[in-house]
Amino acid sequence: MIKTYVVTHLRKMEEGIPEGLQVVDLPMTSEERTQVRRRLETPSGLVLNLALPTGTVLQPGQILCVVEGVAYRVVAAPEEVLVIYPRSLKEAAQVGHLIGNLHRPIDLSGEVIAILYDAALEERLRNLGLVVVREMRSFAKTPLPGHSH
């Protein structure tokens, strides 16, 4: 018999993981972390039916739920990204301008900018003379203030 658990709310990130619990990581791509109304099967076969509020975005490190002494934690799954290595402030500004105009999410880590893979965007970045490397790695978009048109 398949066990099913319905997830309707999330623990606060600052609550952390209670001591004594086993932790099971649930790898999810950045797109999957926005799909909060779906069926998710854990490695042990437990089915989690996500029924979270519209607009919820799951964050890496967040505890999705605790069931029978097991904490299910969201982790960023490796996915195809473009990693841009700006060599100057001017190059970083060019990247920011181009990606910002396209309203694409970015992952800022250290001195590099990562974006989800897009062949046309890769070509545009290379045509600007930027150092761009295609990699498989986790992508956790950096929360930045937004605006609307």
Swiss-Prot record:
GO terms for molecular function: nickel cation binding; unfolded protein binding. InterPro entries: UreE (IPR012406), UreE_C_dom (IPR007864), UreE_N (IPR004029), UreE_N_sf (IPR036118). It comes from the Bacteria. Pfam families: UreE_C (PF05194), UreE_N (PF02814). SMART domains: UreE_N (SM00988). Keywords: Chaperone, Cytoplasm, Nickel. SUPFAM superfamilies: Urease metallochaperone UreE, C-terminal domain, Urease metallochaperone UreE, N-terminal domain. One of its GO terms (cellular component) is cytoplasm. It is found in: Cytoplasm. Its main location: cytoplasm. One of its GO terms (biological process) is protein folding. Belongs to the UreE family. Involved in urease metallocenter assembly. Binds nickel. Probably functions as a nickel donor during metallocenter assembly. This is Urease accessory protein UreE. It comes from Synechococcus sp. (strain JA-3-3Ab) (Cyanobacteria bacterium Yellowstone A-Prime). The lineage of its organism: Bacteria, Bacillati, Cyanobacteriota, Cyanophyceae, Synechococcales.
